[in-house]
């Protein structure tokens, strides 16, 4: 098996950035999202302007008010954050099926199968970050490396709105000079134990014998020993294998104009083909779904002998299925095109432009 390519995407000050996006008057201000200071509320997210005052996540809100009395304090809107997160996760899944969400605002992506001589991991990460910006108006940071630990570390090295790559040829320099508190997974309590045992940076950790680390930290000692050497064999665990790819659109008004509907079918076929191309899949079934003005859902599906993924092939099949479904006297409000029964696609004829 060749070298893996893992991306860790971390949204920049996610909750605060969403609030600044939706309330432009907050841009450039010290924004703190969290519970009420009068109770036991804590800071969920602080903008970089607020962090300059020492405010950080998980800090009691009362303490944040003392550090930044002129800050802009905002109650969290979790439904909005969840909706925005879903858009971001859908972008990830349009590139690869192997996505491991860690929270609303971060995830690991295994893109090993996408990287080629003419398409680097850095380029793919830039495309993903571009899509996030265009669809949500939010910036993100990306870390790229050959394992999850290093990708996570890299994503925090050039924030906000940055991208960092850790290669085999620079990993030792980065790890040896890294403050021990900056190692992913080393919190305040662990850091104190590290200092007690003379470990202040990656070089100090590297110099410790594995048995000694196990004596100090128990089972965690083995993992810390490996981290000091940039070792992490854990796979990116995707929680769902995609069985189909599709898109649908709701019309502003109910329509029964064939020409207008077929233009939309063509557009949906192109979008579906683009998503298939990104995840390097083809499919052997095509489904067309319509919803009538009376909210009745109708669909037709066709199984094909050979898998397809081009927009022309998808459209031709979808066109035929729509003709089986249509009723000139029944306006429709929604139409969708889906390709299912997916299988891997050879990519030698693909180019970087499939990702643009």
Curated annotation (Swiss-Prot):
Disulfide bonds: none annotated. SUPFAM superfamilies: DNA/RNA polymerases, Lesion bypass DNA polymerase (Y-family), little finger domain. Its EC number is 2.7.7.7. The keyword Cytoplasm applies. It catalyses: DNA(n) + a 2'-deoxyribonucleoside 5'-triphosphate = DNA(n+1) + diphosphate. Its main location: cytoplasm. Gene3D superfamilies: 3.30.70.270, 3.40.1170.60, 5' to 3' exonuclease, C-terminal subdomain, DNA polymerase, Y-family, little finger domain. The keyword Ligase does not apply. Keywords: Cytoplasm, DNA damage, DNA repair, DNA replication, DNA-binding, DNA-directed DNA polymerase, Magnesium, Metal-binding, Mutator protein, Nucleotidyltransferase, Transferase. The record marks 15 as: Substrate discrimination. Mg(2+) binds at residues 10, 105. GO terms for cellular component: cytosol. It is an enzyme of class 2 (transferase). It is found in: Cytoplasm. InterPro entries: DNA/RNA_pol_sf, DNA_pol_Y-fam_lit_finger_sf, DNA_pol_Y-fam_little_finger, DNA_polymerase-Y, DNApol_IV, IMS_HHH_1, Rev_trsase/Diguanyl_cyclase, UmuC. Its cofactor is Mg(2+). Belongs to the DNA polymerase type-Y family. Monomer. This is DNA polymerase IV. It comes from Staphylococcus carnosus (strain TM300).
């Amino acid at each position: 098996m060749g070298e893996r390519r893992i991306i860790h995407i971390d949204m920049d000050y996610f909750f605060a950035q969403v609030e600044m996006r939706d309330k432009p008057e907050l841009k450039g201000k010290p924004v703190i999202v969290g519970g009420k200071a009068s109770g036991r509320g804590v800071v969920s997210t602080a903008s970089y302007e607020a962090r300059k005052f020492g405010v950080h996540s998980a800090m009691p809100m009362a303490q944040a008010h003392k550090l930044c009395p002129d800050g802009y304090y905002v109650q969290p809107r979790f439904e909005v954050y969840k909706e925005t997160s879903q858009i971001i996760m859908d972008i990830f899944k349009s590139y690869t099926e192997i996505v491991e969400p860690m929270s609303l605002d971060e995830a690991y992506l295994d893109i090993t199968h996408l990287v080629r001589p003419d398409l680097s991991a850095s380029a793919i990460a830039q495309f993903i970050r571009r899509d996030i910006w265009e669809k949500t108006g939010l910036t993100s940071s990306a870390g790229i490396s050959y394992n999850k630990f290093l990708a996570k570390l890299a994503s925090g090295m050039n924030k906000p709105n940055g991208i960092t790559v850790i290669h085999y040829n620079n990993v030792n320099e980065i790890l040896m000079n890294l403050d021990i508190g900056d190692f992913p997974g080393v919190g305040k309590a662990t850091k104190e134990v590290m200092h007690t045992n003379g470990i202040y940076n990656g070089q100090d950790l590297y110099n410790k014998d594995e048995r000694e680390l196990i004596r100090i930290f128990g089972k965690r000692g083995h993992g810390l020993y490996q981290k000091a050497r940039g070792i992490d064999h854990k796979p990116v665990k995707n929680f769902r294998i995609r069985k189909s790819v599709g898109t649908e659109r709701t019309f502003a008004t109910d329509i029964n104009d064939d020409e207008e509907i077929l233009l939309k079918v063509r557009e949906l076929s192109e979008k579906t083909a683009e998503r298939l191309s990104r995840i390097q899949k083809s499919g052997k079934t095509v489904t067309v779904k319509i919803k009538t003005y009376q909210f009745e859902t109708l669909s037709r599906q066709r199984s094909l002998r050979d898998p397809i993924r081009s927009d022309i092939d998808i459209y031709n099949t979808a066109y035929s299925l729509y003709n089986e479904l249509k009723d000139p006297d029944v306006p429709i409000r929604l139409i969708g095109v889906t390709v299912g029964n997916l299988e891997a696609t050879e990519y030698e004829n693909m180019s970087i432009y499939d990702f643009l």
